[in-house]
């Protein structure tokens, strides 16, 4: 099951999930991409998102407005849907309308093999890495996440030295091995790291839970601001979304 948490009043760009992406609302684009891989449900926090999804025949459930993270909203949706404890759950974003089907499939495969949870990352350049909106991740020898940060990591101390490891940009999608894992993560007490960086995935690392990271090729960009949307609409074409 794929669940897309969708919040109307995003702090940096209100109503962004309803913004038009080549003739379809953003959240509908995201759901249509997800439905190419598995059954998808949008976890809404507002009736306007529900109505939009229903208009385009996208399955949706109404959840609380008071969740602290998309993961918590996913869990409520999973409970509403009555998912079995052993069912695999993917958490995709409602602001990634250009996410490729191949990336979702890669996440699904990684989740099958991950004992706790999985996510994806892509190689980025130094200029991209400077943006705090693009989260960076560093990995251990088994491609599990060591840390996620809005800062540039790993930091290259010797500026004239050649970088030995690629810079990896996190793609904010998650796979939980089963619903029980999702339940477990949400019962853990929030930690200071996730509050400092405003990155919910740091809770898992803080409590020594493994996050497997699949490195993928992707041109997708998250839409965090009005400027992001305007830039994305210049870069992408409608033809790329017709799959």
From Swiss-Prot:
Gene3D superfamilies: Spore Coat Polysaccharide Biosynthesis Protein SpsA, Chain A. InterPro entries: Cytidylyl_trans, KdsB, Nucleotide-diphossugar_trans. One of its GO terms (cellular component) is cytosol. Transmembrane segments: none annotated. Its EC number is 2.7.7.38. It is an enzyme of class 2 (transferase). It catalyses: 3-deoxy-alpha-D-manno-oct-2-ulosonate + CTP = CMP-3-deoxy-beta-D-manno-octulosonate + diphosphate. One of its GO terms (molecular function) is 3-deoxy-manno-octulosonate cytidylyltransferase activity. Keywords: Cytoplasm, Lipopolysaccharide biosynthesis, Nucleotidyltransferase, Transferase. It is found in: Cytoplasm. GO terms for biological process: CMP-keto-3-deoxy-D-manno-octulosonic acid biosynthetic process; lipopolysaccharide biosynthetic process. The keyword Nucleotidyltransferase applies. Its main location: cytoplasm. Pathway: Nucleotide-sugar biosynthesis; CMP-3-deoxy-D-manno-octulosonate biosynthesis; CMP-3-deoxy-D-manno-octulosonate from 3-deoxy-D-manno-octulosonate and CTP: step 1/1; Bacterial outer membrane biogenesis; lipopolysaccharide biosynthesis. Belongs to the KdsB family. Activates KDO (a required 8-carbon sugar) for incorporation into bacterial lipopolysaccharide in Gram-negative bacteria. PANTHER family: 3-DEOXY-MANNO-OCTULOSONATE CYTIDYLYLTRANSFERASE (PTHR42866), 3-DEOXY-MANNO-OCTULOSONATE CYTIDYLYLTRANSFERASE, MITOCHONDRIAL (PTHR42866:SF2). This is 3-deoxy-manno-octulosonate cytidylyltransferase. It comes from Helicobacter pylori (strain HPAG1).
